[in-house]
Swiss-Prot record:
Complex and partners: Tetramer of two alpha and two beta subunits.
Protein name per Swiss-Prot or TrEMBL: Glycine--tRNA ligase beta subunit
GO aspect biological process, one term: arginyl-tRNA aminoacylation
Signal peptide start-end: none
Reaction catalyzed: tRNA(Gly) + glycine + ATP = glycyl-tRNA(Gly) + AMP + diphosphate
Any one annotated GO CC term: cytosol
Superkingdom field: Bacteria
């Protein structure tokens, strides 16, 4: 069957840069799924994305679906005809659905009976008839939170669409996509190359766009060019460019023909904290800052133009003029803010609402101050420094710098606290209170910072859950999922001895009578345990391992971590599967039993050698493991418990648990409950699959 290259390009106005990659990848994935669902064989599927286009190219696409044989079994003959041999309604309905009459149906005869049968040879449809519809379906499934209309059209898309190119080999596939009839016309760069030209063959893409349109459609190529040229530009001035992945992606999504240039700013601005300068360079202007080999910010920046200019110095000068007022603003704010102490901003926090039912930022500050001190006492941090950090924690939100450059919250608090002569761990805590901000982010570096970060996040969790505003679906306006995971990461990775039960109770207590949810403590803990599940799945632990530990509801995060790792190791042992099955059997036996168990096993009632052996083994292990459990050495405990495999197997092979004699039966059930209790001190391994 003939195979050809297929190309679809959607020409648009400027697409959202932060969404460009996801749009392109989703388009390719959706279209591939459509091809596979339609049984159209194909080779490699490539995606292309630039500010004004999304494209997918498919190699070796079959010209038509393969023919296929269809079989549909109908009602059994007994139900297909009545006593007089007339077709039943069920048979007629089935036949109608197949496009035949009952008389035209074949018979399927097996050892189990006889049925009506429809067989047909279905000829595959040409790809030309299917592709436009498949493109429309793939586009309709893109992750676009907000669609827009343009002109007088009813069509909706992320941005207005101007061209649609659908080519199978050299032929245009007729069809309408997003209100535009397909053609072979594509658009080039706005200011370079040909504004508009025709493409003869799908195989010419994306090379023809590069040569005639001056557009690099290959997203990864464009990104790699920017990275390479920016690194070289930084080296030429003796520095290292800050090529953060997120900004690199965004800049690659803003330009069609990247040209990397280097500019500078006045050295006097380096007196301003680097974070503020970097914020305006990266956040506002999409520039790459440059650092020297010691990690200090240099008075240079690298930017990417979207055009090859005959006079690049003009572009450089223009960008230097644009950034100077922003840096001057930062300098002014920094000087102005330092004219008063950070603590002097406390009264102004009363004018800012944290949440209508939960009070102002000043109220939140008081709670954080108290909770940070409480946490510090639990983890051995300096209580006075923790409460001081709590008091100052939100003061920088009232400064000019943070008001103008919002992403500098925390870090400016640190700089202003240092200027005021605060203790260093207090100053650092003000910066690190929001950590970790995202998956993989650094954790607070000192105990005071840990106490403040935990207090800030727990106050938010307790408050928002306390008024019943739980996260729903993908809506989480107070970032409670991030806060919960942040608390858990700090406690686990810093190995802090904190219990979620008492921690949550203290956070709730500090709200007084403001909270309306009577189950707030349980709700917060369950929510946080749910975050544990997601976190440990991402770490590679199996779902049933996590469920086995969650069944014990351990509220100490560090303890939870030790249990999960212990069970994961236990599963590698030869005895694991047999003991998990035995625990499941014991669990089922105990669940079905209506007998009241004894407090302990009565040795005098034990008769069978296998039950005597198990009882003795359990007594020995219980005494050995008591200090092991107390120390939280769960891995070592499970290794010891694995030695029970042979004894447990012998018990089930030779002992009738549900004996007729009541005393014997209850004693054996009690023995099994003691076996299960030992394992339950780590996890419910009966849940392991």
């Amino acid at each position: 069957m003939t195979q050809q290259t297929f190309l679809v390009e959607i020409g648009t106005e400027e697409l959202p840069p932060k969404a460009l990659r996801s749009l392109a990848e989703s388009f390719a994935a959706n279209f591939t799924a459509e091809l596979d669902n339609a049984n159209l064989s194909h080779g490699e599927v490539s995606w292309y994305a630039a500010p004004r286009r999304l494209a997918v190219k498919v190699a070796n696409l079959s010209a038509a679906q393969a023919d296929r044989e269809v079989e549909k079994r109908g009602p059994a003959i007994a139900q297909a005809f009545d006593a007089e041999g007339k077709p039943s309604k069920a048979a007629e309905g089935w036949a109608r659905g197949c496009g035949i009459t009952v008389d035209q149906a074949e018979r399927l005869v097996t050892d189990k009976g006889e049925w009506l049968l429809y067989r047909a040879h279905v000829k595959g449809q040409p790809a030309q008839l299917l592709l436009a519809g498949m493109v429309n379906t793939a586009l309709s499934k893109l992750p676009i939170p907000k669609l827009m209309r343009w002109g007088d059209k009813e069509t909706q898309f992320v941005r207005p669409v101007h061209t649609v190119t659908l080519l199978l080999g050299t032929e245009v596939i007729p069809g309408t996509v997003l209100g535009i009839n397909s053609d072979r016309v594509i658009r080039g760069h706005r200011f370079m190359g040909e504004a508009e030209f025709t493409i003869d063959s799908a195989d010419q893409y994306p090379q023809i766009l590069l040569e005639r349109g001056k557009v690099i459609a290959d997203y990864e190529l464009r990104k790699s060019i920017i990275k390479r040229d920016a690194e070289q530009a930084a080296q030429q001035i003796g520095g290292v460019a800050d090529l953060s992945e997120s900004l690199l992606e965004e800049v690659a999504s803003l330009v069609e023909w990247p040209v990397v240039l280097t500019a500078k700013f006045e050295e006097k601005f380096l007196a301003v904290p680097a974070e503020a300068l970097v914020y305006t360079m990266k956040g506002d202007q999409k520039y790459f800052p440059v650092y020297d080999t010691a990690g200090h910010l240099m008075p240079h920046f690298i930017f990417v133009a979207n055009i090859e200019s005959k006079d690049p110095q003009q572009i450089i000068s223009g960008n230097e003029k644009v950034v100077r007022p922003r840096l001057a603003d930062a300098e002014f704010f920094f000087k102005t803010d330092r004219k008063k102490r950070l603590e002097d901003n406390l009264p102004r926090l009363e004018t800012v609402l944290f949440q209508q039912q939960l009070g102002t930022l000043r109220d939140k500050t008081d709670r954080i101050q108290a909770l940070a001190g409480w946490v510090a006492a639990q983890i051995g941090a300096d209580v006075n420094h923790a409460t001081r950090a709590g008091l100052l924690s939100k003061c920088d939100l009232m400064t000019n710098m943070v008001f103008e450059f919002t992403d500098t919250q925390g870090v400016m608090g640190m700089h202003y606290a240092r200027h005021d002569g605060e203790a260093e761990d207090v100053a650092v805590a003000l910066n690190e209170q929001y950590q970790p901000r995202f998956a993989g982010d650094d954790l607070p570096s000192n105990p005071v910072a840990c106490a403040l970060a935990i207090a800030d996040k727990m106050d938010t969790l307790a408050g928002i859950f306390g008024i019943g505003q739980h996260p729903k679906g993908d809506k989480d306006p107070f970032a409670l999922r991030r806060a919960a995971l942040g608390v858990l990461r700090i406690i686990v990775e810093k190995n802090l001895s904190l219990d979620l039960q008492t921690l949550t109770e203290e956070a709730v207590r500090l709200y007084g009578s403001k909270l309306t949810n009577a189950k707030v403590v349980d709700d917060v803990i369950e929510f946080m345990l749910g975050r544990f599940r997601a976190w440990y799945q991402d770490e590679g632990h199996s779902v049933d391992t996590i469920q086995a530990v969650l069944a014990r509801r351990p509220t100490k995060p560090a303890d939870f971590d030790a249990r999960v790792k212990a069970v994961t190791y236990f599963r590698t042992l030869d005895a694991a599967a047999a003991l998990a099955a035995a625990n499941k059997r014991v669990s089922n036996i105990l669940a079905k039993s209506t007998d009241t168990l004894n407090d302990h096993v009565h040795a005098s009632i034990l008769k069978e050698p296998a039950e005597l052996k198990l009882a003795t083994h359990l007594v020995v292990l219980r005494d050995q493991l008591e200090p092991v459990f107390a120390a939280g050495q769960y891995k070592e405990a499970l290794v010891e418990l694995a030695a029970l495999r042979e004894t447990v197997d012998e018990f089930f092979e030779s002992v009738m648990v549900m004996a007729e004699d009541d005393a014997v039966r209850v004693n054996r059930l009690t023995l099994l409950s003691k076996l299960r209790e030992l394992f339950l001190q780590v996890a419910d391994i009966s849940l392991l699959q």
